[in-house]
A protein has these predicted regions:
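Accessory beta-strand-rich segments of carbohydrate-active enzymes
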Residues: 129, 148-255, 279-280, 293, ...
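Extended carbohydrate-recognition surfaces in non-catalytic/accessory domains of CAZymes
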Residues: 48-176, 229, 235-238, 250, ...
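Extended substrate-binding grooves/exosites of carbohydrate-active enzymes
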Residues: 74, 90, 94-105, 191, ...
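An acidic-aromatic loop/edge-strand motif
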Residues: 143-146, 197-199, 205-272, 276, ...
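N-terminal secretory signal peptides
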Residues: 1-19, 30-33
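N-terminal twin-arginine translocation
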Residues: 17-26, 31-60
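Beta-strand-rich structural segments
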Residues: 272-276, 669-672, 712, 748-766, ...
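Short S/T/G/P-enriched beta-strand
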Residues: 365, 646-668, 679, 722, ...
């Protein structure tokens, strides 16, 4: 955490390892053979750490007696309901009196027959399983049949049996959802428990009074995705984790434990706080203690409070301070983390405890100097990202969150924006552990009770995370900036005030596509601009004391592996094209990266995403804004950012050199590089040497002839790096490459497999589009496939896929039994030449499973 004073500095105001093996194994990122990140300095660090002994995955949610938090993901059953026909919706809503009496919902009792329901584990997104439909109204959500006009595929029911042992007789028990899309009704043992109408904020229900102790219990969750929260693909169903949490009646309040650090000289002061609630039958005398533990497990500080008396159904606030000598600061290069073990004691014993992860750091936004972290100037090199991925939709396994962040980190990114909603906890935790800063954004910009509730949930949930450097209360709320600017100013002020009340350590802002002269912007600590590079330049002249950053920039568009725009095929060339309101990668970064007063910014977007197909409509089913595609395969612009954001030398030449039939035509050849000079060779002959402009690129026009193009980058007259593209032959074989060849046998971990086609020389064929089939057997299961083609309407859930410009991706998930996962890939169909099939084996190792509700 940073200084308790909000980290804004207008003009008038003024020995530990970085990422540990423990952190990597926490989410299964330890790499035995990674083709994704091994090339970068960060990737080399990951690979090095992977060679050291690690920790079992269960320690990710280590139980601290007597509290239990049990994963509630396994062993569910699912069936579609219906949005308008009660007869096809378990009879729900057939009578106006459904809610008249408690305990009468038969579908959540033991006698109900669910034998024909589909068995599945969570997280689950049913929208990604549905076919595509040509519907202009649905284009922003990815042309999936979800919404009020599709009642037969917009409601889903989840059901599960579970045991509550007799030992839980005197405990409080909650079911906790990290997120479900969108409108949720929960029933337990025939009783209606509660509802939630937001697709992103976590929610929970106290089940204590409704459970049969020492017996079987039944929970049913109805999820209705008829309405959306955004204008992008959002999925449908219980797409995040579910937990069953058990505590003593005297327990810590949810998300009430805070650790706020103030760095001074070589030390830091920790302001510790929490709230204890008493849901027992008697008045309790309780005290709270803190134990601060570093990454090695060593206790480095302690604190304790005097006892307080807490009334029945009452609560008490506890606070203390602790000192850290020579703290290991959290930074993007060394994301050092500490844990605070918070314990409630009463009657001579521990009644409740929890572990709170935090970091010590100081983040400052300055009106003249931009952004600094721990006193060092640092540009925010960020991307905006939605939360879906090829093959799995919105239901991302935890490991895939780390995979996606690793792609962005490999590019040189050091920050992400959670566009446009509260993120999943695993994304935030991965950012904490990887050293990725974050702009954390709420979905609904409103000072209504519902809007403030969502905002409060987000801030409380994540205010201890060092990766978060600013809160965002909204995105492009142009009505609140224009005709309702008066109301917008009041809404913005109320939301900013709520953020400051809950977390006085961070700045508050929003992504604004107006002039920031009125409306919601009045109350912001720092000013964010979406696009319009003249806007922030003029604003800075008029308001030189307000810190600025690019909240959303670029909107460059391209199709991976495509080098000529074709409106009939819905493809865009890779030469840094933009939409009318956007800027090229070079233009936006020259402005935000080149002006000292700008803190940096967030490019739209890191990954391609489903829905909002831009610049084309049907049959395009996802956007083409990404710097990488839906699978995480880099587009050429990736290497512009890698050159100017990263620390490693870069030379990247493009396009590929397979242009049969275009002999003699001029082909633009570009090179992204951070070298002093680049010389281009065409079939062994020099086409000239060029100096590389700062934050720019070099380019030539070359008459195509089969052979090779090669770029040689030099510094100080010495060639340091080369990159080459050769004309390949036709594809003759398939190759499979896993991001890891060993994963955890925990029922959750995944391996991400790159599929490519090779010619007879073993070279990747960049134009191959063969249709392949996949077979997965052994100790794992196929869970999804993709290829990064924005126009591909093949199923993400069938084990077959066409290569797109030479690539596809398969995702497999481990079972809980250690062994081997066998993946096979072969060409499907009789068209074209035969391809040599490929096989790959992934080992799944036995690990201690994290605590979970037993799978029936």
């Amino acid at each position: 955490m940073n200084n308790p004073q909000r980290a804004v500095r207008p003009k008038e105001r003024g020995r530990m390892p970085g990422i540990s093996r423990r952190d990597l194994l926490y989410s299964g990122l330890a790499l035995s053979a990674s083709t994704l990140v091994a090339r970068s300095a960060w990737g080399q660090t990951v690979a090095l750490m992977a060679s050291h002994p690690g920790l079992a995955s269960a320690e990710a949610l280590e139980a601290i007696a007597p509290r239990e938090q049990l994963l509630f993901d396994f062993g569910w059953k699912f069936q579609f309901g219906h949005g308008t026909d009660p007869a096809r919706d378990l009879g729900f809503g057939n009578s106006q009196g459904d809610f008249a009496k408690t305990g009468e919902f038969e579908f959540s009792k033991g006698k109900f027959d669910d034998s024909k329901w589909r068995k599945l584990n969570l997280p689950h997104d049913w929208a990604v399983e549905l076919p595509f439909v040509w519907d202009d109204v649905q284009n922003s959500h990815g042309f999936k049949p979800v919404g009020r006009r599709y009642p037969e595929t917009s409601v889903g029911w989840y059901r599960r049996e579970f045991d509550i042992p007799a030992s839980d007789k005197d405990r409080r028990i909650w079911v906790e959802f990290d997120g479900a899309f969108r409108s949720v009704l929960v029933f337990v043992n025939g009783c209606f428990i509660g509802r939630n109408d937001n697709g992103y904020a976590p929610f929970r229900f106290d089940l204590t009074d409704f459970l049969a102790v020492g017996a079987k219990n039944y929970i049913v969750v109805r999820v209705d995705a008829s309405f959306g929260d955004g204008w992008f693909y959002e999925g449908a169903g219980i797409y995040r984790h579910v937990w069953l949490t058990k505590t003593d009646p005297l327990h810590l309040g949810r998300w009430e434990s805070t650790v706020r650090s103030t760095v001074s000289g070589s030390g830091a002061t920790l302001a510790l706080g929490t709230i204890v609630e008493n849901q027992g039958k008697n008045i309790e005398s309780a005290k709270v203690s803190w134990k601060i533990v570093d990454a090695s497990g060593k206790t480095v500080a302690t604190a304790e409070t005097p006892a307080q008396s807490i009334a029945v159904d009452g609560a008490a606030t506890f606070s203390a301070t602790a000192k850290l000598a020579n703290p290991a600061l959290w930074s993007v290069d060394e994301p050092n983390l500490y844990s605070a073990i918070v314990t409630v004691e009463s009657g001579g014993k521990a009644r409740d405890a929890e572990r709170v992860s935090f970091g010590v750091r100081t983040a400052i936004f300055d009106a003249e100097k931009g952004f600094s972290l721990n006193g060092k100037s640092l540009k925010i090199q960020g991307t905006c990202n939605h939360q879906d991925h090829a093959g799995v939709g919105a239901a991302l396994p935890d490991r895939l969150q780390w995979f996606r962040l690793a792609v962005l980190r490999e590019m040189g990114g050091n920050a992400v924006r959670t566009s446009h909603n509260m993120p999943t906890p695993e994304w935030v935790e991965a950012c904490d552990r990887m050293g990725m800063m974050m702009m954390c954004e709420t979905r609904q910009m409103s000072s209504s009770a519902e809007g403030l509730s969502q905002l409060e949930t987000m801030v409380k949930r994540y205010r201890n995370s060092p990766s978060i450097i600013l809160w965002s209360i909204g995105n492009e709320e142009w009505v609140m900036q224009s005709e309702e600017a008066e109301q917008g100013a009041k809404v913005g002020a109320t939301m900013v005030r709520k953020c400051h009340e809950l977390d006085p350590t961070r700045v508050v802002s929003a992504a604004v596509n107006g002039d920031n002269e009125k409306g919601v912007s009045d109350a912001f600590d720092i000013i964010g601009f979406n696009y319009n590079l003249k806007g922030p330049e003029g604003y800075h002249k008029e308001h030189p004391k307000r810190p600025l950053y690019g909240s959303e920039t670029s909107s460059a568009i391209s199709t991976r592996g495509v080098y000529s725009t074709d409106a009939l095929r819905n493809t865009v060339n890779a030469y840094d094209s933009v939409v009318p309101w956007g800027e090229t990668a070079e233009d936006w970064w020259k402005f935000y990266g080149g002006n000292d007063y700008e803190a940096g910014g967030f490019a739209w977007t890191g990954f391609d995403y489903r829905g909002e197909p831009t610049p084309y409509g049907w049959p395009s089913i996802n956007s083409q804004f990404g710097i990488v595609d839906m699978c995480g395969f880099p587009k050429d612009t990736f290497y512009y950012y890698k050159a100017w954001w990263g620390k490693d030398p870069v030379v990247h030449v493009f396009p590929h050199w397979n242009f049969e039939g275009r002999e003699g035509e001029e082909i633009p050849v570009w090179v992204y590089s951070n070298m002093d000079e680049v010389e281009l060779f065409v079939n062994g002959q020099s086409a000239g040497r060029q100096k590389v402009p700062h934050l720019g690129h070099v380019q030539w026009k070359v008459k195509y002839a089969p052979g090779a193009i090669e770029a040689r980058g030099s510094k100080g007259g010495t060639v340091l790096l080369t990159d080459k593209r050769e004309t390949t032959g036709p594809a003759v074989a398939i190759k499979l490459i896993a991001d890891r060849t060993e994963i955890n046998a925990d029922g959750e971990d995944v391996a991400v497999i790159k599929v490519e086609a090779l010619d007879k020389e073993g070279r990747a064929v960049p134009t191959a589009n063969n249709h392949l089939g996949f077979k997965v057997s052994g100790a794992g299961a196929f869970i999804g496939v993709g290829n990064g083609d924005p126009n591909c309407q093949e199923s993400d859930k069938e084990p077959k896929r066409s290569l797109f410009n030479g690539l596809a991706q398969v995702i497999v998930q481990a079972t809980k039994e250690p062994g081997e996962i066998h993946i096979e890939a072969a060409k499907e169909g009789w068209d074209g030449p035969v391809l040599t099939p490929a096989k790959l084996t992934i080992t799944t190792k036995k690990v201690e499973l994290r605590p979970a509700v037993l799978d029936k």
